[in-house]
Amino acid sequence: MASLQSGGDAAANGVDADVDGAASPPSAKRPRAGAGAAAITDAEVRAEFAHHDRAVARLNNGTFGCCPASVLAARARWQRLFLSQPDAFYFHHLQPGLARSRAAVAAAVGAGDASEVSLVDNVTTAAAIIMQHVAWSFAEGDFARGDVVLMFLYTYCSIKNSIHAYVARAGATVVEVPLPFPVSSPDAIVAEFRAALAVARDGGRRRVRLAVIDHITAMPTVLIPVKELVAICREEGVDKVFVDAAHAVGQVPVDVRDIGADFYASNLHKWFFCPSAVAFIHTRKDDPVSSKLHHPVVSSEYGNGLPMESAWIGVRDYSAQLVVPDVVDFVNRFDGGVEGIRRRNHDKVVEMGTMLAAAWGTFLGTPPEMCGSMLMVGLPGSLGVGSEDDAVGLRTMLRKQFKVEVPLYYNSKAAAADAPPEMVKDGNGDPVTGYVRISHQVYNVREEYEALRDAVAKLVADGFTCRKLRPPEKEETLA
């Protein structure tokens, strides 16, 4: 195989070249943050997200996140660097680049140092790493059959599936915390958690080996008092705590050391502007368990510690993990950096949610202090959302007929006991069973929320109900 003799070929591929002719890590081709640097303008924000479909009101940043054009360009440069000379990329650039990304993550989330951070594809992968370890603890006799894993009723489905696929099969008893919704205060969550923990411990006859706590539940979205729940776990002798923070980084302040969980994992492609897919898992380096965690994809790095095992799982595209420093540069172009973005997103989503609730005669599913950049808003009861199928059907109608993309939630559970009556029925006295989960990110504008407002108002004015979406046989079962 011929080697590059000069920088010409590398430059043609959009990468730089070392003096020996080998391609070097790509340099950014955009403004950098710095002292005295001008904040990003509205026009520049629009340009960064010009690849979004402008015909759609995009109110669902939570599921897939977003990535600005400048970061996508940086990713493409890494991809071209690999394609231009894969051997040099592997031997000289991949691991230093991933180390820079781990250091950037560690600084952003308050980790002790970069050795406590492992980069993975997503929180689903992080959960598999943890559940694999817990399953081995059962298989090797460290845990006894019947010992408990505690999780929320609203724990995300893939995490629940991981718990059952690994841990329940190994002999664990799974106990769910039945969180209320809508909810009017964090105290209701704390009370339910304490009650479920008491059930799990069964008067001290069972050991709770792992508690899985969401930082922000996905659906319905609720900001959980995670630090308080971790402290309760410590008081009650829970062995290990895993915080599923899939939506946290970029939505709420995160200090993993202050939170104090044994395992903390968050996606970076949801609210931190990374391309899909990249996440991290944090474990304290002084915790002996950290050396026992292994990536489920076993490679030549097996046994070299989770950060290194995760840094090489075979030939694949690592570019999403390599651009974290570029993302840090991007967020620092905004006034206040990521914290400024977070505060403005929170204020805007509350403002837009309040506007929608007032227009529809409904209410917010949580108080403002229990949300980040996503918020649940009740739909008019006359829409008759009576099942998860109804919620999916109505969401599809909003997408196809009104060009509004927003997740819907069917609430079949009771509200918190202390929830006021105005968080149960709408202004017409109809029970509220359907909710939209709106989000706000830097690219959103008021007109998108007004499109959702007007679409729902039109459906109500036209006398639409979800009965019209149901096939006849389904209608009979719900009658």
From Swiss-Prot:
Keywords: Lyase, Pyridoxal phosphate. Signal peptide: none annotated. The keyword Lyase applies. The keyword Lyase applies. Its cofactor is pyridoxal 5'-phosphate. One of its GO terms (molecular function) is L-cysteine desulfhydrase activity. It comes from the Eukaryota. Gene3D superfamilies: Type I PLP-dependent aspartate aminotransferase-like (Major domain) (3.40.640.10). SUPFAM superfamilies: PLP-dependent transferases. This is Putative L-cysteine desulfhydrase 2.
